[in-house]
């Protein structure tokens, strides 16, 4: 089992050495201008840039959500006296119960279309 562990360790070290050697040679294959630019970028700290972007995106999202909520609230208040909304708000179960209690007052009307008496319904 120790030989397997040694083999694994040896392979890992070999792959790591090849990869690091390749990356170092690839990185050295740059011009002086690219190296100067890379040194300047490495010297700068981008943590504050990321923080700034997060704050700006957060403020923008807060403003958008506030506008959305205020618009929805104003539309809800604007249409509160609309007959459609009053229709929904009313308690229809109570109306049905009151109609059932007064069955003696109910009336039925039958309407007949005399012009359509010659037509038959096809199966």
Swiss-Prot record:
UniProt name for this protein: Potassium voltage-gated channel subfamily E member 2
BP terms from Gene Ontology: cardiac muscle cell action potential involved in contraction; cellular response to xenobiotic stimulus; establishment of localization in cell; iodide transport; membrane repolarization; membrane repolarization during action potential; membrane repolarization during ventricular cardiac muscle cell action potential; multicellular organismal response to stress
Gene name per UniProt: Kcne2
InterPro entries per the UniProt record, alphabetical: K_chnl_KCNE (IPR000369), K_chnl_volt-dep_bsu_KCNE2 (IPR005425)
Main localisation: membrane
Keyword annotations of the record: Cell membrane, Glycoprotein, Ion channel, Ion transport, Membrane, Potassium, Potassium channel, Potassium transport, Transmembrane, Transmembrane helix, Transport, Voltage-gated channel
Family matches, as Pfam families: ISK_Channel
Family note: Belongs to the potassium channel KCNE family.
């Amino acid at each position: 089992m120790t030989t397997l562990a040694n083999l694994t360790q040896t392979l890992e070290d070999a792959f790591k050495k090849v990869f690091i050697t390749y990356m170092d040679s690839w990185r050295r294959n740059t011009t002086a201008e690219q190296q100067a630019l890379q040194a300047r970028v490495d010297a700068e700290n981008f943590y504050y840039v990321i923080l700034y972007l997060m704050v700006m995106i957060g403020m923008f999202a807060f403003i958008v959500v506030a506008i959305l909520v205020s618009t929805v609230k104003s539309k809800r208040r604007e249409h509160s006296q609309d007959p459609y909304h009053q229709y929904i708000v009313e308690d229809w179960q109570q109306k049905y119960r009151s109609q059932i209690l007064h069955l003696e007052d109910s009336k039925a009307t039958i309407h007949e279309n005399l012009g359509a008496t010659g037509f038959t319904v096809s199966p």
